[in-house]
């Protein structure tokens, strides 16, 4: 690698580290690194969101622990299997060449055994402590990430994250099924929201890393179509995400009014950052800002769903309706 390429790589790496600052401050042990623990909290948050959309919320502590524990173990297994499959690819990229598997810190046999063990443990925990549907959906999410996205779609099409995003959208279904034994329309709403949010979220990151992906032949949208095309696609999916998020007002069993009010600043900020990137699609700082906010956005949606199911939210909705009807009566007189 010549000096100019090395300088470009160092710049891109610094951008990536700034997007996820913990990468600078925290070095994970090899066995934890392959589990991709940074991805797990958001998966568990959307699982909780799926639970909050049901009449059975809140769940008993044992069922809640088993659901989240099983989900975390399955996500860790999926991350490890993803690292195994992409080990040779990671060796070819300086940014990833020092990871646990390509650097030889862990053997492929050890990682595979750990992934199988986590999968079995997740299955046992979910079957014994939750139900068969939650266990089956969790395994479906694992297989979707490893087989559908990593093996089939990622190396072949620019639409990889559009269809492969199903893996990240399954946790809400797991949460709903854990609570009720079935998914229900509200669970499917959150599934759809995550599906629409995922491309806009991931493509913002892919703009930062488009040269990395291009160097190893991975057809991410920014690498193939360019930043301008990608920014326009992000705009479309971002608008669809905002419209879908509003439907949560009707998806919630109660507390939809408070959810709708609190949702406004989240959607406003998301649209603002998307519009800024669309105006300057090659601005890495704008792509970074959008990527960061998109993560906070989904965490925020899930938090709003939980808040909306509290007694305070129910009382707020009741009082608001009383005021509304009182005003209506005064106007009619």
From Swiss-Prot:
BP GO terms, sorted: heme O biosynthetic process
Stretches that traverse the bilayer: 64-84, 110-130, 133-153, 161-181, 189-209, 246-266, 287-307
A Pfam family of this chain: UbiA
GO cellular component, one term: plasma membrane
Lineage, opening ranks: Bacteria, Bacillati, Cyanobacteriota, Cyanophyceae, Synechococcales
Full protein name: Protoheme IX farnesyltransferase
HAMAP family (UniProt xref): CyoE_CtaB
Subcellular location: Cell inner membrane
Listed pathway(s): Porphyrin-containing compound metabolism; heme O biosynthesis; heme O from protoheme: step 1/1
PANTHER family: 4-HYDROXYBENZOATE SOLANESYLTRANSFERASE, PROTOHEME IX FARNESYLTRANSFERASE, MITOCHONDRIAL
Catalytic reaction(s) noted: heme b + (2E,6E)-farnesyl diphosphate + H2O = Fe(II)-heme o + diphosphate
Gene for this chain: ctaB
